[in-house]
Curated annotation (Swiss-Prot):
Name of the molecule in the record: Large-conductance mechanosensitive channel
Protein localization: Cell inner membrane
Biological role: Channel that opens in response to stretch forces in the membrane lipid bilayer. May participate in the regulation of osmotic pressure changes within the cell.
Stated family: Belongs to the MscL family.
Membrane topology field: Multi-pass membrane protein
Subunit text: Homopentamer.
Source organism per UniProt: Bordetella bronchiseptica (strain ATCC BAA-588 / NCTC 13252 / RB50) (Alcaligenes bronchisepticus)
Annotated keywords: Cell inner membrane, Cell membrane, Ion channel, Ion transport, Membrane, Transmembrane, Transmembrane helix, Transport
């Protein structure tokens, strides 16, 4: 067998193993779940923060202009400034990403905790003792009969 076919066989064995497939599924689900958390922050959490604070608190549009291009007279929005080449510190977007991360970590923590709790319950459930094999049962019956005969 050549080195190339050996490498291909080794790669196939690795790719078909459960761990590699589980990892791939986890990455795909994690990416989709990240989008859900991002939507949760943008569409649920931030509107609630705005409502509680009684104003429009949109962290994603908060930034600090560090330097402007010479002669710039356009709009002072983050998108326009960065497009024009301004040096902009987007601290609001960073805060939004931190909120996303904290929520994602919190939800994953609770999911892992629930999974471990379910596993512990499965492990803690005592298994019913297995019935003894038939030959052992017959030998016990013979023993009991012999004890009864000796006792009488």
């Amino acid at each position: 067998m050549s080195k190339a076919t050996g490498f291909i066989k080794e790669f196939r064995d690795f790719a078909v193993k459960g761990n590699a497939i589980d990892l791939a599924v986890g990455v795909i689900i994690g990416a989709a779940f990240g989008k859900i958390v991002d939507s949760l922050v943008k569409d649920v959490v931030m509107p609630l923060v705005n409502f509680i604070l009684g104003g429009s608190v949109d962290f994603s549009n908060k930034f600090l202009v560090l330097s402007m291009p010479d002669g710039y007279t356009g709009p002072m929005t983050y998108a326009d400034l960065t497009k024009a080449g301004a040096n902009v510190l987007a601290w609001g977007n960073f805060i939004t990403i931190i909120i996303n991360f904290v929520l994602l970590a919190f939800v994953i923590f609770w999911m892992v905790k629930a999974i471990y709790s379910a596993r512990r319950k499965e492990e803690a459930a005592p298994e019913a003792p297995a019935a003894p094999p038939e030959d052992v049962t017959v030998l016990r019956e013979i023993r009991d009969l012999l004890k009864d005969k000796q006792g009488s």
